[in-house]
């Protein structure tokens, strides 16, 4: 039985500080009295995380970052450390997005190091996993997902394995402005696999969100699937009205 249903959005490389604060203020005015079965979260760009967190500090909305380094400090020019994110008051951090894997050399090992660092510093890792179209068509999807999940968890030891961890299943072929949403049945099947693999490595099965062209038209059907524990929304939620619309649809469908 679901205790909470996660519904959030990552803004990627979008929004000025003024735009981010406008979104946050709209959301802060909506959330009081909203369905407490749903846990909202937003993931702004680094330039806005502190201010957005402050703007939402009186609400239950969680705020995260889109990436971080695994080291606490050091000669890592251009990187952001876990203590820096905690200093901003952040609750979670998105790790392993396919764009970072493809364009910035992210690997299962570095995702694993970052996952362990996030847990160490009291943040929830939101670990993105997903197969490419070529991997799906060649029958490798299950093997790819299993390897990504195992890699993300490989450096967790002892009590760290009991920390709150989230996965987001984002098939690479389903994301972006040209993405084709996965069918609800297919997404549910792949998310069941992720839960099986993660559940064998952790004391409890972590929640798995679905991300990949989530929109007002498919949100309710996705929410109705037993293995989909939340929605991780892209461009359909980049405007406050769009995000609020999908929050309402998720609430009605639970």
Swiss-Prot record:
InterPro entries found in the cross-reference section: Aldolase_TIM, TIM_sf, Triosephosphate_isomerase, Triosephosphate_isomerase_AS
Catalytic residues identified in the record: 97, 170
GO molecular function annotations of the record: triose-phosphate isomerase activity
Localization, UniProt: Cytoplasm
Coarse class of the protein's main subcellular location: cytoplasm
Residues binding substrate, per UniProt: 176, 213
Keyword Cytoplasm annotated: yes
A Pfam family the protein falls into: TIM
UniProt catalytic activity: L-erythrulose 1-phosphate = D-erythrulose 4-phosphate
PROSITE patterns linked to this entry: TIM_1 (PS00171), TIM_2 (PS51440)
GO BP: gluconeogenesis; glyceraldehyde-3-phosphate biosynthetic process; glycerol catabolic process; glycolytic process; pentose-phosphate shunt
Family that this chain belongs to: Belongs to the triosephosphate isomerase family.
PANTHER family the UniProt entry points to: TRIOSEPHOSPHATE ISOMERASE (PTHR21139:SF42)
Name of the protein in its database record: L-erythrulose-1-phosphate isomerase
Organism listed in the record: Mesorhizobium japonicum (strain LMG 29417 / CECT 9101 / MAFF 303099) (Mesorhizobium loti (strain MAFF 303099))
Lineage, uppermost ranks: Bacteria, Pseudomonadati, Pseudomonadota, Alphaproteobacteria, Hyphomicrobiales
